[in-house]
Amino acid sequence: LEAAFQRKVYTLIEEGETFGASKLNSIMKEVLTDFWGDAIEIDDDAALTWMRQAHYYMGLYSYTYSAGLVISTAGYLHLKHSETGAEDWLNLLKSGGSKTPLESAMIIGADISTDKPLRDTIQFLSDTVDQIIAYSAEL
């Protein structure tokens, strides 16, 4: 729901439109109605739910989710494929925020100054989807 709401808002922004709360209310109600259909009644107050999402107003909030997914996937792959993976993971945890994000990621072999961890994550997700499809075909 949040992604659909944001997609519509950012599309309007990219198209050069300006708008206020009433437009945001309209977009939110439309998204909720599209999602829930006639399963529930969407009243006018439901359109205000976008206001309680403080992270909408925080720059780069979606970046933290993406970075977290990429770094955690890199950590999992390092743990799975490296003889020092478990030790490196413990060292990352022991670092306790004493390093920059780049330095922390490097402990588990994720050089986030390059696109390699992102590409590895995309490949991992692609492989996972392929596995799910293969397992589903066996059912």
Task: Give the positions of each predicted feature.
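C-terminal, non-catalytic "cap/extension" segments appended to globular domains
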Residues: 3-139
